[in-house]
Amino acid sequence: MKRLTYLLCFALGTLTSCGASAARTAPEPEKAQSSDTPRTPTVRASDEAIQKYFASTLIDQKGALPASTLPLEDIKKARTQVWRLWAEANKSLSEDKLPALTPLSKESVAHSWLLTPEKYNGESFKAVMPFYYGSKGDKPEAGYPLYLYLHGSGEKKGEWSTGLALALSFQDSPSAYFIPQIPNGEGVADGQLYRWWQKSKLEVWEKLLRQAFLSDQIDPKRIYFFGISEGGYGSQRLASYYADYLAGAGPMAGGEPLINAPVENLQHVAFSLRTGYNDTQFHRSELTGYTRDALQRLAAQYPGYYKHFIDIIPKYGHAIPYQHTTPYLSQHVRTPQPKQVNWEDYPIDGLYRKGCYNLAPLKRPEGKERIYYQENILGNTVDLKINTVKYVEKKVSDWYTSFHLVLLYDKVYEPAKGGKLRIYLSPELLDLSKPVRVLVNGQQVYSGMVKTDWSHLVESCSRFFDPERLFPAAIDIAY
């Protein structure tokens, strides 16, 4: 396996706000104050205005956001309307589309997507990602569970074909599979582009999720990422980063330092990690143990959360039995709008998330790379703890001396200052007909009624592209 480079990673580029006629821009952050009862409903934002906004966000342009007061009793109908318009905008977008879902077999036809060119040491490399996309069994009423399988870092064509064979063998039917081949593998850029978490690949996972959610073939509450070896590293990192989209994740024969994949983010993700006891290269089995220990502590601290199945398998090395992961994952369903959220916001390959669950950073504190949000909604009170995170080296590998591999860190938290945050709200999270309180680090920053508006439905749709997270209300706070 190629030498690992443990880089901090990721933050996907989500969609920005964009234009429409007869519209206003998104509201400025609100200060702690009492608000009036929402005004009498006016004419809602037009379909044309919403479609223009969506069309603009899909090509990463900015503009005015359609806005109009939304009565509480119309939220369900409005969500349906907004999602329909989002689907129409995506259909009109000129881009590679997911192919029709056909039965997965040894003869499955390969498809491909053109990626953003990849860069290494000042050079640019064309990136084309071949993939298989197919189903097993009869489609459930809610749609197929979707598995993204990431292969290891051997000869990439052989690894890819092995991935297809494994997908066919796993006992997880009914299911759908997206099985990609790494665009630039061995022999290119010293192997340093053989990573599943780099920018061009992150754009693909965004696109896959967005298009899968629009498909009537895929269950949006049952998305799973898993992989083997290099694919194990990738799926562990992506699980922490994409936690709000996933029902489960299952890296195998991997094991990441937790700075690359903070376990705090896995509160609502069923997480399986299986590594051979004798798989000591790059400290894989040791790092798997540290992940197990951290999840055990969190599961004890938060009963009912942080479900995990971590196995350091006696007598096995890098090759292990692979058949146990997807049956475990398939038992779990995503929680898209939890009332309790732990989220460490961090960059991967220089990119930050634009939001997670119902939280969206509008401004990060200057000079602070990582922010840890802890949200607890009890009744109509949103209680937030917002802290900066500093990693302090605790244990460094004494085996690998040609590069600096930190195995364990201590974390130091301090109250964060100088940031702005958008908190999306919905009937699933609290009672929008009653006043809402927001606390940040024990201080009240908002108290009053929250106005429901078409603008929030539209903006949250373009930000998260998730049918389970169309938020009709939001509060912007400064801390």
Go through each PLM region and give its residues.
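Primarily recognizes the serine-hydrolase "nucleophile elbow" in alpha/beta-hydrolase
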Residues: 214, 221-267
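Alpha/beta-hydrolase-fold serine-hydrolase catalytic core, especially in secreted/extracellular enzymes
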Residues: 35-65, 297-479
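Active-site machinery of serine-nucleophile hydrolases
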Residues: 143-213
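The feature captures the conserved acid-bearing segment of alpha/beta-hydrolase catalytic domains
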Residues: 248-330
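Loop/turn elements at helix/coil->beta-strand transitions in domains of secreted/extracellular proteins
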Residues: 142-146, 172-177, 219-223, 243-248, ...
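A domain-start/cap signature at the N-terminus of enzymes
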Residues: 18, 23-144, 433, 446-449, ...
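Bacterial N-terminal signal peptides
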Residues: 9-16
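Sec-dependent signal peptide recognition
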Residues: 2-9, 290
